[in-house]
Curated annotation (Swiss-Prot):
Active site: 32, 129
Sequence positions that bind an anthocyanidin: 32, 381
PROSITE patterns xrefs: UDPGT (PS00375)
Chain's gene name: UGT708C2
Protein family per UniProt: Belongs to the UDP-glycosyltransferase family.
Identification of the protein by name: UDP-glycosyltransferase 708C2
Length: 457
């Protein structure tokens, strides 16, 4: 069966004027879905004008995924939807449900050729999540597969190095030629355990990255210059294909206007702190209360997205009960407590002057695009290395120690980031560089145009 599949997709030769047909294969969870929706939208629009098929992994886990996918296809009628069903294992105690889904996708990727064989016109290339790397690169070796990583170039380097990392101890920083060392505190502990579910599918896919046509990253040249240079020089990981920055990707426009915009319109410029820890970071009730008391004492206006569960369907908390009546009233007098916002609209408003963030990579790129300074409070996964990138690039500061306690530290850190003109100017510079990269003729826009152009030769 595998032998037949590998010959079913010969490389497609197009004339200069033909429209390439590309398949975009997203992974799981909002952190993976959002950049893939942005990529699909970008590829289908001018100046790239590809015919796009967007592969959606079924079943979905969160309500947010369902909502975004439905909205996306309503606003992009020319993009074809292709569902790819995987079998989810039964929930396991103390195992992240997203890890289970990631593994099911990785284990099912070898079945993709059967689904792709139904598509017309012939496929010119695939842009796929890291989770599909082994399955696509072994079953469709003649079809160009661009692996799209949804994290920073620096953390992607670490993921690519996991096959070696899992054999080592965690006692000393990880050194990869051409790059600053990776402190062990920044590395997810599972990476040192080859038997961990997350590490096992990371190793399986990392071992086949060399067969990808290229690695595309939602970053830009001036944001991670040392990492990109080291990867493309061949000094760091010599078996990798070209690593191509194409970000920050254009973001989707939402039909529904953010309900908090009228409130923001009434606030002074750069006076509001936006607080969000992403779609998968659920804080404990004690952490939430400590942060709430700190924000109340900081005397700063804010918008805070409060999340108490990794999966939105499971979040049944009532904010008034969570904070208690007295603290809830005090917080509501100074800011807004919500469970969801349109983050890009919030960050783009002139009243927003800072972002207390977990440093998920989508959030970092959205802040970079708008020049909003970040106070980094990474929680898990890639976030500590992303915070390292944020600080090095001049977009924000990473306060590594909260020794005085969350409540006291929040007061200090919030006042620092909201009143630091040097940091604000540096973040504005990053925003200008991001805009130049994705404008016509910029480094990221040109890189993506070159990829599409190569499909026509």
């Amino acid at each position: 069966m595998m032998g037949d599949l590998t010959t079913s997709f010969p490389a497609t030769t197009l004339t200069t004027n033909e429209q390439p047909h590309v398949v975009v294969c997203s992974g799981a969870g909002m952190g993976h879905l959002i950049p893939f929706l942005n990529l699909a939208s970008t590829l289908s629009s001018a100046p790239y004008r590809c015919k796009v098929t967007l592969l959606i992994v079924i079943p979905l886990i969160t309500d947010a995924e369902s909502h975004h996918i439905s909205s996306f296809f309503s606003s992009h009628p020319t993009i074809h939807r292709l569902d790819f069903h995987v079998n989810l294992p039964a929930p396991k105690p103390n195992v992240d449900p997203f890890f289970l889904r990631y593994k099911s996708i990785s284990d099912s990727a070898h079945r993709l050729p059967v689904h792709l064989s139904t598509l017309a016109p012939p496929i010119s290339a695939v842009f796929s999540d890291f989770l599909f790397t082994q399955g696509l690169n072994t079953t469709l070796p003649h079809l160009p597969n661009y692996t799209f990583t949804t994290t920073s170039a620096r953390f992607f380097t670490l993921m690519s190095y996991v096959p070696h990392l899992a054999k080592s101890s965690s006692s000393s920083p990880v050194e990869i030629p051409g790059l600053e060392p990776f402190p062990t505190d920044n590395i997810p502990p599972p990476f040192f355990n080859p038997d961990h579910i997350f590490t096992s599918f990371t190793i399986s896919n990392a071992n086949y990255l060399s067969l990808s046509k290229g690695i595309i990253v939602n970053t830009f040249d001036s944001f991670e210059p040392e990492t990109l240079s080291a990867l493309n020089s061949g000094d760091s990981l010599p078996d990798l294909p070209p690593v191509i920055p194409i970000g920050p990707l254009n973001e989707l426009e939402h039909n529904k206007q953010e309900e908090l915009l009228p409130w923001l319109d009434q606030q002074p410029e750069k006076s509001v702190l936006y607080v969000s820890f992403g779609n998968r970071t659920a804080m404990s009730s004690d952490q939430i209360l400590e942060l709430g008391m700190g924000l109340e004492r900081s005397d700063c206006r804010f918008i805070w997205v409060v999340k108490t569960s990794k999966i939105d369907k499971d979040d049944k908390s009532e904010l008034r009960k969570l904070f208690g009546e007295e603290l809830y009233v005090k917080l509501s007098e100074k800011g807004k407590l919500v469970k969801w916002v349109n983050q890009t609209e919030i960050l783009g408003h002139t009243a927003v002057g800072g972002f207390l963030s977990h440093c998920g990579w989508n959030s970092v790129m959205e802040a970079a695009r708008r020049g909003v300074p970040i106070l980094a409070w990474p929680q898990h996964g890639d976030q500590r290395e992303n915070a390292w990138v944020v600080e090095k690039a001049g977009l924000g500061v990473w306060e590594r120690e909260w020794s005085s306690g969350i409540q006291v530290a929040i007061v200090e850190k919030v006042k620092m980031i909201m009143g630091n003109n040097d940091l604000r100017n540096s973040a504005v510079r990053v925003g200008e560089e991001a805009k130049r990269a994705c404008d016509v003729g910029g480094s990221s826009a040109t890189a993506l145009m070159n990829i599409i152009g190569s499909l026509k030769r």
